[in-house]
A protein has these predicted regions:
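Active-site-adjacent substructure of cysteine-protease-like catalytic cores
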Residues: 62, 72-156
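A basic- and aromatic-enriched beta-loop-alpha substructure that forms the phosphate/nucleotide-
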Residues: 38, 43, 47-87
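A diffuse structural propensity rather than consistent per-protein peaks
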Residues: 34-38, 102-103, 171, 199
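Core regions of eukaryotic protease modules
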Residues: 67-80, 87-93, 187-191, 198-206
Length: 207
């Protein structure tokens, strides 16, 4: 578990939870990190099997009206759309797939053990008792484990309690509410953990 050190660096911390120090070496400290940026951090750290599953290719223009995004939106939109164009090229190390994914499918992938899963969520959705205000609080978590019978996920949360090393158990329905909130685009990153899918010469710097 790697805790985040600033309120905005959960993406970088999640990359370190999966790949360790090599991810920290590859990641630039950027206040605004989109999921396509996080995919770039993984590939810069040496991961070759990286897949971004999302319901929106590029930037959803409606996000310009959301308080969470508006401060960085104009600065980010051109960069993020360009990153998506590069990622959809035939020779890209990142595979981008436009689709929605069911909780049961996420559980099957995680339980297989061959891939790590990082999800973009509305942080407030992971705490059903928290009073929700208007808007969106984007946050990245690692889906560490799943229990199909109980229909629960074990999440590794970089903003979680140090006493549990950030672990938190949530129901599938709670997780679905958090990851399907407006602002997430239902983004999921699947990163191969197989040794053959890593470049031993990494990390390089991801800008």
């Amino acid at each position: 578990w790697t805790p985040q050190t600033r309120e905005w660096d959960c993406a970088r911390a999640c990359a370190a939870c999966v790949l360790g120090r090599r991810a920290l070496d590859a990641a630039r400290r950027r206040r605004s990190t989109w999921t396509i940026d996080l995919a770039g951090i993984f590939t810069a750290a040496g991961a070759r099997g990286v897949m971004l599953v999302t319901k929106t290719i590029g930037v959803d223009p409606r996000l310009a009206e959301d308080a969470f995004y508006e401060e960085d939106y104009l600065r980010d939109v051109a960069r993020v759309n360009a990153a998506f164009r590069r990622a959809t090229a035939l020779d890209s190390p990142v595979r981008v797939v436009r689709r929605r994914v069911r909780a049961g499918d996420i559980a099957a992938i995680v339980l297989n053990g061959a891939h790590a899963c990082v999800a973009l969520v509305d942080r407030r959705g992971l705490s059903p008792t928290e009073t929700k205000s208007e808007g969106f609080e984007g946050h990245y978590v690692v889906v560490e484990d799943a229990n199909v019978d109980a229909k629960t996920f074990t999440l590794m949360d970089p903003a979680g309690d140090a006493r549990t090393k950030g672990r938190k158990i949530v129901t599938w329905s709670c997780f679905d509410d958090a990851r399907r909130a407006f602002g997430t685009d239902e983004d999921l990153l699947f990163v191969s953990l197989r040794a053959k899918d890593f470049n031993v010469d990494a990390p390089r710097r991801f800008a």
